[in-house]
């Protein structure tokens, strides 16, 4: 299979990023309900093959191991043959990124769509790299109250440790939320970036979706409010922790159920200066 020039065929490329358990799958399901949008299950393409640390990228070798990783990931989501679009080997991280984007382009074209939406929360760490290759890429940052994310991440990592690098400690969950919040805050007011607050989305879904669609360049569709069928399509069978996305919208919190009063007080103390108010734009 030979790579093809797809820039004219693809109208828009969108990444949904944030911290796990923030509502990224919900946002994906809603936006992917539009008839022009293609959205696969989480690809993990970038986070599984490209170093998170910037200083490691210039000397990174992309070869047999990385190609095999992408092959496995493609097989899980049903696009095995597209691994042929990868370079045989390269030291050029930008070239590797181009090939990964081209693979998603080809998925989108195959499904007769012209807008694609990829949702792997930790692709948050690759925003600048992706933008350097495709400057018009749009990023949707999903944010949720720290107490709720920390409780959910702490809980789900104990129920499904094999998918979350083992059970996460309270301090680790706090660290991840705060770190990712700092990264997202760097892009406030930037072109092609929109920040979606989970609590607002649940309370005022149409308003928030319209705002998000405007940044993407997508017409709002009422289909986005009937998203539960799409929620099943964008998740793999083993991702049982995402089942809540096929239920009606609801504000829910595990904070008081998961943590003791002492733990709750500790978490609230650590988060006392962290507010999502800066994202209210």
Q: What is each of the regions a protein language model found here?
A:
Residues 38-118, 123-124, 248-249, 253, ...:
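PAPS-dependent sulfation machinery
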Residues 25-36:
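A conserved segment at the C-terminal end of the G1
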Residues 119-120, 130-155:
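Conserved phosphate-donor/acceptor-positioning beta-strand/loop module used by diverse small-molecule
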Residues 1-15, 52, 91-94, 154-157, ...:
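PAPS-dependent sulfotransferases, especially Golgi type II membrane carbohydrate sulfotransferases
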Residues 19:
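P-loop (Walker A) phosphate-binding loop of NTP-binding proteins
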Residues 22:
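ATP-binding Walker
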Residues 114-121, 189-216:
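Phosphate-binding beta-loop-alpha motif at adenosine-nucleotide cofactor sites
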Residues 107-110, 183-193:
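A structural motif corresponding to the C-terminal end of an alpha-helix
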């Amino acid at each position: 299979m030979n790579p093809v020039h797809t820039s004219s065929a693809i109208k828009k490329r969108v990444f949904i990023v944030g911290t796990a358990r923030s509502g990224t799958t919900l946002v994906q399901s809603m936006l992917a309900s539009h008839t022009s949008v293609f959205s696969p299950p989480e690809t993990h393409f970038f986070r599984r093959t490209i170093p998170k640390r910037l200083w490691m990228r210039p000397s990174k070798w992309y070869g047999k191991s990385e190609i095999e990783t992408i092959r496995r990931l493609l097989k899980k989501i049903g696009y095995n043959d597209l691994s042929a679009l990868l370079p045989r080997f390269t030291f050029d991280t930008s070239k590797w990124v181009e090939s990964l984007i081209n693979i998603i382009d080809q998925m989108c074209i195959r499904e007769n769509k012209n807008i694609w939406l990829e949702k792997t929360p930790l692709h948050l760490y690759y925003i600048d790299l992706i933008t350097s290759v495709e400057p018009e890429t749009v990023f949707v940052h999903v944010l949720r109250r720290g107490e709720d994310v920390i409780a959910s991440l702490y809980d789900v990592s104990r129920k499904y440790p094999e998918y979350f690098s083992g059970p996460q400690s309270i301090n680790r969950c706090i660290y991840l939320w705060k770190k990712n919040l700092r990264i997202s805050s760097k892009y406030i007011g930037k072109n092609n970036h929109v920040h979606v607050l989970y609590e607002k989305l649940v309370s005022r879904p149409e308003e928030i979706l319209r705002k998000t669609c405007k940044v993407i360049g997508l017409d709002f569709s009422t289909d986005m409010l009937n998203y539960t069928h799409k929620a099943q399509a964008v998740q793999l069978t083993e991702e049982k922790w995402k089942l809540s996305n096929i239920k009606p919208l609801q504000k829910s919190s595990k904070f008081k159920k998961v943590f003791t009063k002492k733990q709750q007080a500790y978490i609230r103390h650590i988060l006392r200066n962290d507010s999502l108010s800066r994202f209210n734009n």
